């Protein structure tokens, strides 16, 4: 069902493509897969302040090309490129091959589901009221051209003794429609009361052509999709039993 499955995984090969783009035989596949996991762990750990949304890994012949999608490219590069040189050396130690690191700037972080989820999680850790954080994120996304957005927050919200889930939605988010360009992001807030999960779905319009690279091309061109029927904001409280 469209509501249950990861929206990105459902659309792979239709209007989305994989973040690891390489082919390997049976003997090398497991090794390269573990390398990808290590590379992403290191980069996310080192670039916590850089607002990294995606890390795309490609492997041409005897090379490794890493593309970092970040809202703060200056933090990734560092002073005179010193930080990116350190990252290149660390990735080269893992892959034992020539490493090329490219940086792609995310010009509208308010329309990137991963960055929106991380922003809300950070606000929850700073004890900002969860309703205010969710409402602010919804308003920012709709103002910048999203056709719809849904945000779920679950856990001991506001320090309540009983965990619950609350969600806001504005516009429309057609999870069943395969041609819909839907971005999805997840983040975890580590609060003094326990962990709170944040999920974000952002609908940016429909992609009519059957092209796995369509979403990447759209991001490169800076398209966000028009502002369609926004409908009314909805909120729902579910108390855990």
Swiss-Prot record:
Query: What is this protein's function?
Result: Binds the lower part of the 30S subunit head. Binds mRNA in the 70S ribosome, positioning it for translation.
The yes or no answer to whether the keyword rRNA-binding is present is yes
Q: What is this protein called?
A: Small ribosomal subunit protein uS3
Organism, by scientific name, is Bradyrhizobium diazoefficiens (strain JCM 10833 / BCRC 13528 / IAM 13628 / NBRC 14792 / USDA 110)
PANTHER family the UniProt entry points to: 30S/40S RIBOSOMAL PROTEIN S3, SMALL RIBOSOMAL SUBUNIT PROTEIN US3C
Classify the source by domain of life.
Bacteria
Q: Where is this region: Disordered?
A: 217-241
What family does this belong to?
Belongs to the universal ribosomal protein uS3 family.
Please name the InterPro entries in this protein's record: KH_dom, KH_dom-like_a/b, KH_dom_type_2, KH_sf_prok-type, Ribosomal_S3_C_sf, Ribosomal_uS3_bac-typ, Ribosomal_uS3_C, Ribosomal_uS3_CS
Q: Name all KH type-2 domain ranges.
A: 39-107
Q: Biological process GO annotation list?
A: translation
The record lists its disulfide bonds as none
Question: What ranges does the record list as Basic and acidic residues composition bias?
Answer: 230-241
Its GO CC terms?
cytosolic small ribosomal subunit
NCBIfam families given for it?
A: rpsC_bact (TIGR01009)
Please state the gene responsible for encoding this protein: rpsC
Q: What SUPFAM superfamilies does this protein map onto? A: Prokaryotic type KH domain (KH-domain type II), Ribosomal protein S3 C-terminal domain
Supply the Gene3D superfamilies for this chain: 3.30.300.20, Ribosomal protein S3, C-terminal domain
Q: Which GO terms describe its molecular function?
A: mRNA binding; rRNA binding; structural constituent of ribosome
Q: How does it assemble?
A: Part of the 30S ribosomal subunit. Forms a tight complex with proteins S10 and S14.
Keyword check for rRNA-binding, yes or no: yes
